[in-house]
Design a protein with these regions (language model features):
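N-terminal active-site beta-alpha-beta segment that forms phosphate/nucleotide-binding
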Residues: 1-101
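A residue-level signal for conserved active-site and pocket-lining positions in enzyme catalytic cores
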Residues: 11, 43, 64, 109, ...
């Protein structure tokens, strides 16, 4: 593969054939120091074939947030198990709650199609998370199956690496 677009296509096809152990990925995330120390955590509502982290919502010692797209920005909205969601312009589910200040978030679990050895992630190409992470001061983590780790995701100057990539084998 020679570019991000080819890699996106490869990763989307690959993950259709991967059995994701969501419980193990959640367990491994919960064992990290970053998770244990965080109070306010931004996760994402999973798309088909994505890692599903929603079982984290059972942890009542944490406050959870889901992203909401507003123009070019990604907002952080409080979310609890059972809260109402609405469909966004991208056909993803978003909370209907009012957003909080980004500075409140201690930890963000970022969605990714795949990640490389330098902790760069390949997203869907909209740049929402890269813009969000540009001045984010908390910890950035990706959880994904180890079969979606690659040599490079062809990072560009605006791409932001995460602090930690968690797989079934932990890190």
């Amino acid at each position: 593969m020679d570019n991000k677009q080819e890699l996106r296509c490869w990763a989307k096809e690959k993950r259709k054939n991967i059995s994701i152990d969501n419980n193990l990925l959640v367990k491994n995330l919960m064992q990290t120091e970053a998770y244990r120390n965080a109070k306010n955590i931004l996760i994402f509502y999973p798309l088909k074939y994505e890692v599903n982290l929603l079982s984290l919502l059972k942890d009542k010692t944490k406050n959870f947030y889901l992203p909401k797209i507003d123009g070019e920005s990604l907002l952080c909205c409080p979310f609890c198990e059972g809260d109402e969601l609405c469909e966004s312009c991208f056909k993803t589910l978003e909370p209907i709650t009012d957003p909080c200040k980004k500075q409140m978030i201690d930890l963000v679990v970022v969605p990714a199609l795949c990640c490389d050895k330098k902790n760069y992630r390949l997203g869907y190409g909209g740049g929402f998370y890269d813009r969000f992470l540009n001045d984010f001061c908390g910890t950035k983590i990706v959880c994904l199956p180890k079969k979606l780790l690659v040599d490079t995701v062809y990072p560009e100057e605006f791409d932001i690496p995460v602090d930690l990539v968690i797989t079934e084998n932990y890190m």
